[in-house]
Regions:
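Conserved BB-loop
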Residues: 1, 6-9, 108-138, 153-161, ...
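Acidic/glycine-enriched connector segments
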Residues: 1-9, 23, 113, 343, ...
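Conserved beta-strand-loop-alpha-helix hinge of the TIR/SEFIR fold
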Residues: 1-37, 98, 137-187, 261-319, ...
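Short, highly selective alpha-helical patches that border small-molecule cofactor pockets
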Residues: 13, 100, 104-108, 370, ...
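C-terminal interaction surface of TIR/SEFIR-family domains
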Residues: 31-112, 181-343, 523-553
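A short acidic (Asp/Glu
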Residues: 40-41, 103-105, 159-161, 188, ...
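Short, hydrophobic/glycine-enriched beta-strand segments
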Residues: 91-95, 345-356
Length: 553
């Protein structure tokens, strides 16, 4: 319950307060101006949300009340949905020192003033003298709730910036891309989205009022990205319930805490059940979260406690609580329960993806989906095949190296037309160091060259399925690459799965096939195709598809 603290008739207030108290509401006084900063006697011990102080920190007047309202809303969300959002989350500032250090310093200092609960990270400030700088940076990146990429003109040339971008993408950390001046997007080997979320001139950081506006924009966009990513975690609870069935029960629905009581396997004599509790987080869990959960369950008879997140974490333990990613938790339990079967190692699944035309925040859903599908495909024993894409190829290479470090080249097949490679043997050798490379013939024009490459990539006996995501929508449908790839697959009776929820051309195609009952696309159930149409649980989607393909004769 929120109390806007102006002059209120006392009787009305007391009735209201009594009712709120009886309902066990959390009462938050709001001091609208300097004269009303002390709450009434009944709630004088409660700390107020100070509107005047929020305005003062930003050098703003009362015309900027909507800005403060957004800040207040984030505070309320952190209280009501503590597993999805935390005000004190870490904001990692990624930059190149040679041309980004000064603006990063100004940004860091202003965030520290305007968002006092937040934890910004800047290597020069947060890495102590004598520490292993890269080890600290790697740890802080993994802990971060949002990754702010300050794209200055020289940052695209930095291998360190490339490493940080790759790390954030593969760890499912929301990335806010902030373009500075005329930074060239073409120099980025990895792009977090199709284009930058925000753009500013470096001189804007010299102006106090403009700097305040920049910080507010960054905080607003960061919040949107964090919540968009966090809300995806809600989908995972159903996926885990499906694998555990009646063996899982709800311990606390609001806190997303669940209890597994599972039969033990692999021993001749009777044993007690495995008793495990897990809690799902959308944000990055920390030591306080682990301690709180451990304390909450201290009187329960159990074997283990796990905090799970939809970010990709390195497995760790804090206060006897295991911190792990949801997909790894699912993977290990699936192995234990015998529900995970390796596919035919000589078969491939082709993944076709391109950024759609949409708000930059939601384009990251495509990258998330591609990463989750790629991991699931390789883990299931299939080879991942794709047509060259300058952004996604680096991600696929890294995923293969993580999943199969000893044999990663044989897990990735990349097709490229010589129209784009143009007999560049140096680039071809670089690609061969990361994958099995197939170069198709250069034709008379770009369109014909792409068609030739797509035929070579898709129309082969060892292609098990085609997965389509995103893509640009064209006025002339024949120019849409996804439609051509689907037709090529259908000619060979190769099952096609179209992910609609990432937007773009695949959303249009999925809608068209849904209206015809998914005829000619694949022989999977309407239920599975409907999931591909509008669901956002991409990991579960991939698992369901792989289960269907593994069971195909």
């Amino acid at each position: 319950m929120v109390m806007l603290w102006t002059i209120i008739a006392m009787k009305r207030f007391l009735r209201f307060y009594k009712k709120a108290y009886e309902c066990k509401c959390k009462i938050i006084p709001v001091a609208i101006n300097r004269e009303c900063r002390l709450p009434q006697k009944e709630i004088e011990k409660k700390q107020s949300f100070d509107v005047w102080e929020q305005l003062r920190c930003r050098s703003l007047d009362e015309n900027y009340m909507p800005t403060v309202a957004k800040i207040f809303a984030r505070k309320i969300i952190s209280m009501v949905l503590p597993t999805l959002y935390c005000e004190s989350g870490e904001i990692f500032l990624s930059h190149r020192r040679i041309d980004g250090e000064e603006i990063t310093a100004k940004l860091y200092d202003k965030i520290a003033v305007m968002a006092k609960e937040a934890t910004p990270f800047r290597d020069v400030i947060n890495v102590k003298v004598g520490e292993d700088a890269q080890a600290v940076i790697d740890l802080e990146m993994e802990k971060s709730d949002v990754f702010v990429f300050l794209h200055t003109p020289k940052s695209g040339e930095s291998d360190w910036v490339l490493k940080e971008l790759r790390f954030a993408l593969l760890r499912n950390i929301p990335i806010l891309w902030v373009k500075i001046d005329d930074a060239d997007e073409k120099k980025l080997r990895i792009k977090p989205s199709d284009s930058a979320h925000l753009s500013f001139n470096s001189v804007d950081f010299e102006d106090e009022q403009k700097l305040i506006s920049i910080v507010d924009n960054i905080l607003d966009k960061s919040f949107e990205l964090i919540m968009n990513r966090s809300m995806q975690s809600l989908e995972y609870s159903e996926m885990l319930r499906e694998i555990f069935g009646e063996k899982v029960s709800v311990y606390d629905e609001q806190e997303m805490i669940y209890h597994i009581s599972m039969d033990r396997k692999g021993y001749h004599y009777p044993q007690r059940n495995i008793e495990q509790y897990y809690q799902i987080y959308g944000r990055n869990p920390n030591m306080k979260d682990a301690c709180r959960l451990s304390d909450l369950l201290k009187d329960r008879e159990l074997d283990s406690i796990a905090i799970l997140t939809n970010k990709i974490l390195s497995y760790s333990r804090k206060d006897e609580v295991s911190l792990d990613s949801i997909e790894d938790f699912y993977y290990h339990w699936s192995n234990y329960l015998g529900k995970f079967e390796r596919g035919n190692k000589n078969m491939e699944i082709v993944v076709s993806g391109a950024f759609p035309d949409a708000d930059e925040i939601y384009k990251q859903s495509l990258t998330d989906a591609l990463i989750l599908f790629a991991k699931a495909i390789i883990r299931d024993g299939y080879e991942l095949t794709f047509g060259s894409h300058p952004t996604f190829q680096e991600l696929f290479f890294e995923i293969a190296k993580e999943e199969c470090p000893a044999d990663y080249k044989n897990k990735i097949n990349m097709y490229i037309s010589n129209w784009f490679l143009n007999d560049n043997e140096e680039e071809a050798n670089r690609l061969r160091n990361n994958c099995s490379l197939y170069i198709s013939e250069k034709k008379e024009d770009r369109t014909m060259s792409l068609t030739q490459m797509r035929k070579h990539m898709i129309q082969r006996k060892n292609v098990k399925a085609l997965v389509c995501l995103g893509g640009k929508i064209r006025t002339n449908k024949t120019e849409e690459g996804i439609r051509e790839e689907i037709n090529l697959a259908k000619q060979e009776n190769i099952p096609v799965f179209v992910v609609g929820s990432v937007g773009g051309c695949s959303s249009k195609v999925a809608k068209e096939y849904k209206e015809t009952g998914w005829s000619e696309l694949n022989s999977a159930s309407s239920e599975l195709n409907d999931k591909f149409y509008d669901d956002i649980d991409y990991y579960n989607m991939a698992q369901e598809m792989l289960k269907f393909l593994d069971e195909m004769v």
